[in-house]
């Protein structure tokens, strides 16, 4: 058996994985989540897809995946999938599974300390993992560049942009091209950070926001956002049953509302950033 395993490992990728393509036969062209399991039942990898069938088949083409996923494919014994009503629902379920299962081949969604925040410390700005009003931010590198752009600025981060842009024009006019390029990159990082913070602040300030991703006709999964987090989720069926679920969701959101939420952490950060990305999508994919 060990010799056979060595032969399999030395074969070209497509040949090694050809026998496993049948594991994804029948996966539908619908949104959902999927799990790769080893022979002993261990969950190796969790993913989500807008089209389960297309995504799962893509793993068995000639293009290599990143090393951890390649290792999971090598140990793969069975694939499970779960059809859900929308890509947003699939993304939220993926977050839950990642936190619960912590599969070894997943690189994201399993460490609550991966978020960073901007904070003024003394006379300068720094990047910290301690929750505060200026975050959460996904990219430590961009946050560090934004902090360097702010320097000793004493005020809201976004208010520093006009003076920084004026400084950039002055440096460029003086033909200090290396300094100008460095400052340009820092300003770009600060602009990204400020845009992300503004989007998060809008979500955190909502009394109640009902997000209903487009799904198959006949039912909708609605998410009730309040106090900077998803306070409730309800399936809205046609007719009086759907109206009752809507009122129940609104009541749950009202109970969960926080008068002033300026900090976000942990699971709420995951869901809030995910919601922010989906709220940028145009109708009819999303209705708010």
Where on the chain are the PLM-derived regions?
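N-terminal cationic and glycine-rich segments that engage phosphates or anionic surfaces
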Residues: 3-288
């Amino acid at each position: 058996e060990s010799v056979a395993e060595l032969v399999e490992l030395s074969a070209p990728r497509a040949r090694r994985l050809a026998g496993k393509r049948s594991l994804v036969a029948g996966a539908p062209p619908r949104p959902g989540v999927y799990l790769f399991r080893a022979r002993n039942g261990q969950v190796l990898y969790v993913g989500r897809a807008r089209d389960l069938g297309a995504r799962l088949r893509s793993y068995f083409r000639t293009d290599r995946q990143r090393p951890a996923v390649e290792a999971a494919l090598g140990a793969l014994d069975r694939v499970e999938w779960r059809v859900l009503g929308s890509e947003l629902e699939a993304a939220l379920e993926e977050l839950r599974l990642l936190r619960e299962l912590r599969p070894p081949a997943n690189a994201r969604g399993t460490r609550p300390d991966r978020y960073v925040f901007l904070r003024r410390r003394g006379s300068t700005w720094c990047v910290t993992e301690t929750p505060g009003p200026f975050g959460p931010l996904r990219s430590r590198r961009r946050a560090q560049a934004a902090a360097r752009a702010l320097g000793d600025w004493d005020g809201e981060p976004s208010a520093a942009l006009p003076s920084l842009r004026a400084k950039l024009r002055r440096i460029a006019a003086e033909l200090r091209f290396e300094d100008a390029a460095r400052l340009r990159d820092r300003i770009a990082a600060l602009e990204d950070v400020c845009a992300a913070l503004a989007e998060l602040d809008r979500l955190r300030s909502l009394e109640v926001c009902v997000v209903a991703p487009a799904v198959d006709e006949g039912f909708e999964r609605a998410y009730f956002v309040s106090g900077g987090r998803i306070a409730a989720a309800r399936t809205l069926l046609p007719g009086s049953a759907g109206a009752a679920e809507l009122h129940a969701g609104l009541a749950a959101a009202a109970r969960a509302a926080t008068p002033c939420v300026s900090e976000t952490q942990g699971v709420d950060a995951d869901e809030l950033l995910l919601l922010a990305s989906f709220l940028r999508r145009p109708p009819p994919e999303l209705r708010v």
